[in-house]
Regions:
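N-terminal loops that bind phosphate or other acidic moieties
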Residues: 1-155
Length: 155
C-alpha cells in the first residue's frame, strides 16, 4: 500500500500530532522536512486566513535545517513561492498558493541540483522535476482545495 510506505496512513489513527505521526513512520531526512510542512499545514487548516504565515514559518525552518534556499532544486522551490503568493494575495491566498507551488516545482526542471541526492547524478538532475518540489506542490494543492471545499460547506 503506497500510503503506508509514505507514512500517511499513520496520521488519521494516531494520538500524536500529524507531523509527529508522519515523522515516526517515515524517518530519514525527507521525513523530517516533510513533517515540518505537515505541521504547518495542520495549523493552516485550522486557521486558513493565516495560511501564508504558516507556510512561511515552515519554509524558514526547512531552509535552516536543510541548509537550502530557493533555487537549490528542493521542496523549497515550491514552498517559498506558495508562501509568498499566499501572503501577497490574502483574498485568493489558497488559489494563489496552489498555483505558485506548481509553477515553482515546474521551474526545477531546468535547475541544477545543489542539495540532496540529485546533485550527484549526471547533469545534477537538469531535465527532471525535483521530487520534493513536486510532492510539496501536490500536498499544497490538495490542502488548498480541501480548505476551499470546507469553507464553502460552512457558508
Amino acid at each position: 500500500d503506497v500510503y503506508k510506505r509514505q507514512g500517511l496512513s499513520a496520521i488519521p489513527n494516531s494520538e500524536l500530532p500529524p507531523e509527529k505521526a508522519f515523522k515516526a513512520e517515515t524517518g530519514g531526512a525527507s521525513g523530517s522536512l516533510f513533517s515540518i510542512l505537515i505541521g504547518a499545514i495542520d495549523k493552516g487548516i485550522e486557521n486558513s486566513s493565516n495560511f501564508g504565515e504558516f507556510l512561511t514559518n515552515a519554509s524558514n525552518r526547512i531552509s535552516l535545517i536543510g541548509e537550502a534556499k530557493e533555487g537549490d532544486k528542493t521542496m523549497l522551490d515550491a514552498l517559498i513561492p506558495a508562501a509568498k503568493a499566499s501572503l501577497n494575495n490574502p483574498k485568493n491566498s489558497l488559489e494563489e498558493a496552489s498555483l505558485a507551488a506548481r509553477e515553482g516545482a515546474k521551474k526545477t526542471v531546468t535547475m541544477p541540483a545543489k542539495k540532496g541526492r540529485a546533485k550527484y547524478v549526471e547533469n545534477a538532475g537538469i531535465g527532471h522535476m525535483d521530487p520534493g518540489a513536486f510532492s510539496t506542490s501536490e500536498i499544497i494543492s490538495f490542502v488548498c482545495n480541501y480548505i476551499r471545499i470546507e469553507n464553502e460547506k460552512a457558508l
